[in-house]
């Protein structure tokens, strides 16, 4: 819940001096990206900007305090201020910040700017007291904000110092409007106006000018002169003499003598106690100070000019001038040291009564009251956890003694979930084990079930499926149906374990159950996770169309619940890219992988490994080895600088091994094989993939017998577990083995099975990456004209893809080849006496590669009619009448020249 006063522009007071000369300068603020108002405390920054903002409707105001260094809190208030300025225009950004569904502040701002692109009126965002921000993450994010904000948005920043926002760059580009302390200082005319509206009897212009010069136009000093003169009924020049040459760092003594010592004891107590509140209203004042009418007392203090300012138009919320508030809090530490804990307790109780647990925790911590802090956490901690107030929760839990956590084991559970969210898996188990060991009395079965559900999640995350399954099953036995969150966790873990074991049908059913429960209770991240798992399972079973449809539902969930910036979005984009790649929709696959990289841009680079492997895979399918090598360089760098799940390593190794196969790099392949551990089993698609990598390297090295043993065992497991996509991949690799070993009949047998299975999986690119060897076999099958219609159609499609992306296949008919061919002793006499032109040789090569007339015309960039002429000429010279005859003739020439076709 947001405190309204932090989003309210200060009310313009009746007795303030209108700074006409500065307002004139600020009138052109909409022409700048940043308006920066800097000066020490007390120069009137906030008052000036509140005057300038008066009458502007498309303006949001955000008043900072020390607590805004938490990135989640900063994001919440900043988006709320924008919503205030735009009358709720940025709905998606608001939902994302409320649900903490963004990867970083910068990515949240990127979404904000997408929505603001449809906002065409001038827009202003004021951030007051920016000097309180010390978090470098926020500074960096605000630099991003300034670089990318829409042209019609002006950011107005008020600060006591130059903020770390890339000011120099903005200044050079003339995108910065600056107002500093020299300009903020009152001139003689403004000082005269100030005294005229503050003092009962006017003073001479010469005297007001002298007073102004004595304090160098410092607004706070002028206010103190007027206040002292009123309270002590003394001449203004006496106060001026005392203030002459003074600055903010030496102001404390003056404020004690001239302000605190000049008010009655009750007012002094009121000022000191209320200063502990960062913002205040009637209810808070009544509870903290004991006043009967807090609102009336606040208004009275305001009338006395004691540096109290209204924070909203309704006059409900107030705050002290920052300079005076800081002074009062310091005095409070000295004068009310023994009362402070009780005052903070009262403040915490009042904030709780008004529904602001975060503020209540702030005061409970300041009071050092562990019992109060415990009670607040017991009632509100899970709500704060679900809103990602993780830093505040960690600080709070650290402040509680261990005994208090043991007496309230749900707080132990909360601390453990905090550790789990930060991937501190070993600490989770240590904490829970210690708690169980030291807890007095028998643990409640439901709580024990919650402990075990969390332990199960930790175990599966840590790569221990056996332990994860054991704990998940115990948890499901212990947890009542009403304990939906932990039951969702345990069910999800059980489904994931079965996935790892290759029990795909049962895993799919459990993941569908998880999705239903998660949707029913709005636990959207588990709903998304379960749908991603369903898609992976369906893909492994060979049901790629069903996997696609599940992905579509998952993308819709992401859109509906604004989950675009969760890391799981990248997971979905990645498996979509894998599916698109399988279907040879390479441009879409690459786009999806790049989108995945963008989603992870705010995370460690190592997280991008899988998407990077997919980019390599797309380049390999296109035959673009240079681009593949560029991506591989980065991928191998990431591999050497991180620890990864075996599935991630397997996917990265897959593209490396295929690349080595394509360029014939046996040395790298052999080194990899020596260093790569062999998985113990092959009962899921993760392990099948790594064994396939091993077999591919063995084939490359000519070790056909061990490779055949591996692939036959993989096929046996794949058939048994119904891992149909893996079976399809295994058959293609076995085909390569048989072909290279000279076992052509076996090669054709497994290729026919792979083609038939591809009618279910839709695989195209898995055939394409095998290159010319695959193309030669497919040409032979097509020439035999014995394939079933669907298989024939797929074979032709695969051949077209190979021809399109592996253009070097027709390089046999280049000039050097033709020159050697014509001098070959066995060259047909017809070719020797009636040689083809270079262009006709190119056309023959493309015909052999399976190109249609239109494709040949496109490849050679000539008209289709020209190609027909070339074909007619070369048919005549070769003595053939049909296209198939030309293909066979080209094949004979290649065999004669020693090419295996």
From Swiss-Prot:
A molecular function GO annotation: DNA binding
GO biological process: positive regulation of carbohydrate metabolic process; positive regulation of DNA-templated transcription
CDD domains: LuxR_C_like
ATP-binding listed as a keyword: yes
Residues annotated to bind ATP: 39-46
Superkingdom, taxonomy of origin: Bacteria
Regulation of activity: Activated by ATP and maltotriose, which are both required for DNA binding.
Subunit structure, as described in the record: Monomer in solution. Oligomerizes to an active state in the presence of the positive effectors ATP and maltotriose.
Full protein name: HTH-type transcriptional regulator MalT
Encoding gene, per UniProt annotation: malT
């Amino acid at each position: 819940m947001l405190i309204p006063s932090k989003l309210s522009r200060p009310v313009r007071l009746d007795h303030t001096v209108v700074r006409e000369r500065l307002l004139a300068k600020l009138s052109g603020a909409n022409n700048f990206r940043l308006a920066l108002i800097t000066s020490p405390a007390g120069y009137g920054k906030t008052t000036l900007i509140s005057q300038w903002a008066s009458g502007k409707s498309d303006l949001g105001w955000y008043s900072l305090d020390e607590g805004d260094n938490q990135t989640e809190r900063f994001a919440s208030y900043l988006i709320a201020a924008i919503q205030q300025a735009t009358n709720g225009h940025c709905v998606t950004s608001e939902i994302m910040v409320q649900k903490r569904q963004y990867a970083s502040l910068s990515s949240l701002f990127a979404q904000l700017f997408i929505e603001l692109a449809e906002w065409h009126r001038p827009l202003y965002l004021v951030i007051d007291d920016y000097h309180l921000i010390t978090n470098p993450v926020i500074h960096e994010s605000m630099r991003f904000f300034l670089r990318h904000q829409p042209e019609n948005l002006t950011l107005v920043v008020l600060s006591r110092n130059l903020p770390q926002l890339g000011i120099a760059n903005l200044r050079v580009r003339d995108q910065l409007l600056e107002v500093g302390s020299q300009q903020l200082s009152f001139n003689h005319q403004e000082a005269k106006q100030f005294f005229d509206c503050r003092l009962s009897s006017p003073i001479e212009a010469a005297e007001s000018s002298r007073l102004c010069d004595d304090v160098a136009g410092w607004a706070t000093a002028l206010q103190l002169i007027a206040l002292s003169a009123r309270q002590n009924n003394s001449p203004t020049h006496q106060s001026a003499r005392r203030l002459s040459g003074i600055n903010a760092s030496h102001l404390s003594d003056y404020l004690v003598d001239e302000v605190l010592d000049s008010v009655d004891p009750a007012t002094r107590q009121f000022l000191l106690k209320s200063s502990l509140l960062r913002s205040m209203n009637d209810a808070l004042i009544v509870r903290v100070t004991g006043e009967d009418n807090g609102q009336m007392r606040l208004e009275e203090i305001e009338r006395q000019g004691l540096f109290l300012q209204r924070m909203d138009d309704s006059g409900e919320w107030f705050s002290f001038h920052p300079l005076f508030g800081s002074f009062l809090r310091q005095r409070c530490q000295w004068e009310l040291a023994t009362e402070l804990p009780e005052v903070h307790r009262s403040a915490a109780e009042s904030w709780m009564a008004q529904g602001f647990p975060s503020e209540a925790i702030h005061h409970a911590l300041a009071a050092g009251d562990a019992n109060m802090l415990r009670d607040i956490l017991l009632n509100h901690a899970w709500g704060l956890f679900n809103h990602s107030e993780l830093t505040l929760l960690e600080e709070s839990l650290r402040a509680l003694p261990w005994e208090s956590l043991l007496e309230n084991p749900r707080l132990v559970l909360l601390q453990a979930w905090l550790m789990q969210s930060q991937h501190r898996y070993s600490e989770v188990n240590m904490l829970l084990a210690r708690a169980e060991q030291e807890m007095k009395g028998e643990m409640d079965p439901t709580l024990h079930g919650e402990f075990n559900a969390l332990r199960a999640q930790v175990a599966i995350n840590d790569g221990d499926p056996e332990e994860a399954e054991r704990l998940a099953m115990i948890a499901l036995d212990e947890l009542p149906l009403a304990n939906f969150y932990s039951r969702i966790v345990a069910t999800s873990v059980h489904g994931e374990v079965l996935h790892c074991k290759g029990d795909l049908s049962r895993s799919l059913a459990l993941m569908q159950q998880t999705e239903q429960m998660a949707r029913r209770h709005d636990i959207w991240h588990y709903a998304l996770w379960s749908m991603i798992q369903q898609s992976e399972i369906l893909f492994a079973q060979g049901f790629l169309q069903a996997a696609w449809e599940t992905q579509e539902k998952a993308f819709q969930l992401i859109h509906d619940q604004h989950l675009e910036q969760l890391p799981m979005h990248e997971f979905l984009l990645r498996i979509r890219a894998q599916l698109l790649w399988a279907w040879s929709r390479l441009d879409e696959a690459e786009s999806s992988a790049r989108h995945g990289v963008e989603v992870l841009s705010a995370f460690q680079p190592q997280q991008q490994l899988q998407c990077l492997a997919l980019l390599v895979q797309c380049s390999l399918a296109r035959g673009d080895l240079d681009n593949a090598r560029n991506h591989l360089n980065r991928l191998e760098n990431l591999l050497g600088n991180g620890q990864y799940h075996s599935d991630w390593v397997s996917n990265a190794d897959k593209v490396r091994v295929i690349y080595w196969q394509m360029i014939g790099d046996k040395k790298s392949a052999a080194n990899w094989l020596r260093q790569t551990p062999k998985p113990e089993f092959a009962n899921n698609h993760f392990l099948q993939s790594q064994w396939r990598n091993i077999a591919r390297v063995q084939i490359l090295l000519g070790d056909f017998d061990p490779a055949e043993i591996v692939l036959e065992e993989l096929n046996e497991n794949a058939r048994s577990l119904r891992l149909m996509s893996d079976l399809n991949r295994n058959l293609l690799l076995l085909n390569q083995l048989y072909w290279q070993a000279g076992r052509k009949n076996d090669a054709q047998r497994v290729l026919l099975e792979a083609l038939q299975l591809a009618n279910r999986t839709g695989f195209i690119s898995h055939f394409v990456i095998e290159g010319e060897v695959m193309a030669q076999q497919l040409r032979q099958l097509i020439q035999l004209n014995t394939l079933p219609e669907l298989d024939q159609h797929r074979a032709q499609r695969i051949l077209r893809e190979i021809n399109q992306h592996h253009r070097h296949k027709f390089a046999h008919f280049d000039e050097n080849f033709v020159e050697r061919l014509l001098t070959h002793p066995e060259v047909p006499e017809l070719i020797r006496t009636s040689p083809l032109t270079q262009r006709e040789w190119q056309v023959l090569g493309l015909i052999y590669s399976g190109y249609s007339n239109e494709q040949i015309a496109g490849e050679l960039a000539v008209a289709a009619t020209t190609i027909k002429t070339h074909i007619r000429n070369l048919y005549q010279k070769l003595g053939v009448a049909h296209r198939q005859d030309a293909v066979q003739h080209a094949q004979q020439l290649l065999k004669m020249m020693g090419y295996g076709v």
